[in-house]
UniProtKB/Swiss-Prot annotation:
Any GO MF annotation of the entry: carbohydrate derivative binding
Domain of life: Bacteria
InterPro entries: Etherase_MurQ, Glucokinase_regulatory_CS, MURQ/GCKR, SIS_dom, SIS_dom_sf
Alphabetized UniProt keyword annotations: Carbohydrate metabolism, Lyase
Protein's pathway: Amino-sugar metabolism; N-acetylmuramate degradation
Catalysed transformations (reactions): N-acetyl-D-muramate 6-phosphate + H2O = N-acetyl-D-glucosamine 6-phosphate + (R)-lactate
Residues the record marks as active site: 85, 116
Record's subunit section: Homodimer.
CDD domains per record: SIS_Etherase (cd05007)
This protein's record includes keyword Lyase: yes
Protein name, UniProt field: N-acetylmuramic acid 6-phosphate etherase
Native organism: Clostridium acetobutylicum (strain ATCC 824 / DSM 792 / JCM 1419 / IAM 19013 / LMG 5710 / NBRC 13948 / NRRL B-527 / VKM B-1787 / 2291 / W)
Length: 302
């Protein structure tokens, strides 16, 4: 599996940074920044494929499915990070979006030797998490050939589970084992083979796009405001108050009052204010509107 690494774009030498070891600090940072600029353009070229991923993921989640990120090393950590941000940002159940990293939680903080090379372990993850055709899996691997990820993708498709691949090399093995391919080609890294850099940045941008767009399509956003956030600390309560203020144009004190009356649910508070209803009626309108605030307000204004 590790043969012909030199054929991978991410493993090639970057001609623009061959002298980075003798550059002064400013030139060194400019060289890194010049490479980073290329990342967003590489992701932009893949938007048509990201659209496919967003549409299928949102459809699965609307129908009680789950989203799983599967990766190793940096790619695995990025999946875990993105998944862990969904509950506080969008008020989702931690089971809805899950990140799985080769080697388990221990690998989040330090490398677990050999974990990424175990294809059978990747296969077993599908059964361990009780994945079904209602779910969707996204495999993340810069090289496009990480055995742990490939094993998971193969097993997913074997069980009629939609598999999506995010990689940074053309014609890679993962692209032969997924239903949707997302392949931002970022070119050779600043430091040869250090895919935590441009490849990792590209992966993070793609994950940001997928979960953000999916949550919008699930009614977790009103305008560009996060209105389903979980209020687990003072900072988030303050943010929720500001969100209600902005969405309804009420004063801070009134926003806080309605937030309390809505049992600390910002979207309920917004609908209460916009439709001049009590919390139970706002909840009913939101249920009728499948959780979409704009639709709930229209229903309550009839």
């Amino acid at each position: 599996m590790n043969s012909h690494l030199e054929d991978l774009t991410t493993e090639k030498v970057n001609d623009d940074t061959v002298n980075i070891d003798v550059m002064n600090t400013e030139d060194m940072l400019k060289a890194i920044n010049n490479e980073d600029i290329k990342v967003a353009y590489a992701v932009q070229k893949e938007i048509h494929n990201i659209v496919k991923a967003v549409d299928i993921v949102s459809e699965k989640l609307k129908n009680n499915g789950r989203l799983f990120y599967i990766g190793a090393g940096t790619s695995g950590r990025l999946g875990v990070l993105d998944a862990s941000e969904c509950p506080p940002t969008y008020g989702t159940n931690p089971e809805l979006v899950q990140g799985i990293i080769a080697g388990g939680n221990e690998a989040i903080l330090k490398a677990v030797e050999g974990a990424e090379d175990d294809e059978d372990m990747g296969r077993s993850i599908i059964k361990e998490r009780n994945m079904t055709s209602k779910d969707v899996v996204i495999g993340i691997t810069a090289s496009g050939r990480t055995p742990f990820v490939i094993g998971a993708m193969k097993e997913a498709r074997k069980n009629e589970i939609i598999a999506i691949g995010i990689s940074n090399n053309k014609n890679s093995l993962i692209n032969k084992n997924v239903d949707i391919k997302i392949t931002p080609i970022v070119g050779p890294e600043v430091i040869m083979g250090s895919t935590r850099m441009k490849a990792g940045t590209a992966q993070k941008l793609v994950l940001n796009m997928i979960t953000t767009a999916v949550m919008i399509k699930l009614g977790k956003v009103y305008g560009n405001l996060m209105i389903d956030l979980s209020l687990s600390n003072k900072k988030l309560i303050d943010r929720a108050v500001r969100i209600i203020e902005h969405a309804t144009k009420v004063e801070k004190e009134k926003a806080m009052e309605y937030l309390k009356r809505a049992n600390l649910k910002p979207k309920v508070a917004i609908v209460m204010i916009k439709t001049n209803t009590k919390s139970y009626e706002a909840e009913r309108l939101l249920n009728m509107a499948d959780g979409f605030v704009t639709k709930a307000i229209k229903l309550g204004s009839k």
